[in-house]
Design a protein with these regions (language model features):
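Short solvent-exposed coil/turn linkers within tandem alpha-helical repeat scaffolds
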Residues: 44, 83-92, 120-128, 156-164, ...
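N-terminal positive-inside, membrane-proximal cytosolic segments immediately preceding the first
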Residues: 1-29, 33, 37
Length: 216
């Protein structure tokens, strides 16, 4: 290959590389614009509509009106509608929590578990309560192993909250006792004694530890 041909080949390769870079940049810009457009033109208005729909449902939830929370009152929609129609919004995610808790109050424990498992939040206290409520639902279904698993998750998810953590750890230990796992129960009782001595459960935890330790 002559020097001229080599130079032409290099120029061609450079141009191809530049084209590729341009295509990548344009593609990135289109993607960014698409995300921005989706957020501004679709997602934000959807979030606003979902939040408006949640307002009445939250009021019913505060009043323990579980059927109205789930299905609405004929004028306002319930959380089941919000979950379906506003999927992907923050309000729909929160609606899953309200749905799970409402089904629990109505003693429909399997549906409570399904909705609460599908809920997630960065608010650690709320997430801990959701885990604990799943544990409660499993306990009502006499599924003790599953209840213990979720009580432990609830009790360790946000250790800074003494009340929530000590309460759910205590429930985990209690169900370990029911399952005949006394050594494991003692370990959790001791964990409560060490980490949460000033909590409601911590004040009386010694009697549970002593009772198990004196058993033959």
């Amino acid at each position: 290959m002559s020097e001229l041909q080599e130079e032409q080949a290099q120029v061609s390769n450079t141009k191809n590389s530049q084209k590729l870079i341009i295509y990548l940049i344009v593609g990135a810009l289109i993607t960014t614009a698409g995300i921005f457009g989706y957020t501004e033109l679709y997602q934000k208005p959807l979030e606003a509509k979902a939040a408006d729909a949640m307002y009445v449902a939250e009021k019913y939830f505060a009043n323990d009106s579980s059927e109205l929370v789930l299905n609405g009152d004929g004028t306002s929609k319930g959380v089941l509608y919000i979950i379906k129609e506003f999927s992907g919004t923050n309000a729909a995610n929160l609606a899953k929590y309200y749905a799970g808790m409402s089904y629990y109050r109505l003693k429909d424990y399997n549906k409570a578990i399904d909705y609460l498992k599908d809920f997630s939040t960065n608010a650690k206290q709320v997430q801990a309560v959701a885990y604990g409520s799943i544990g409660d639902a499993y306990s009502e279904l006499k599924k003790n192993e599953e209840a213990i698993e979720y009580y432990k998750k609830a009790g360790t998810h946000f250790p800074e909250d003494e009340a929530i953590s000590s309460e759910y750890l205590f429930r985990a230990a209690s169900f370990l006792e029911l399952n005949g796992k006394n050594d494991a129960a003692i370990e959790i009782y001791k964990q409560i004694k060490q980490n949460y001595p000033k909590s409601e459960k911590g004040f009386s935890i010694d009697k549970y530890i002593n009772r198990l330790q004196v058993q033959p």
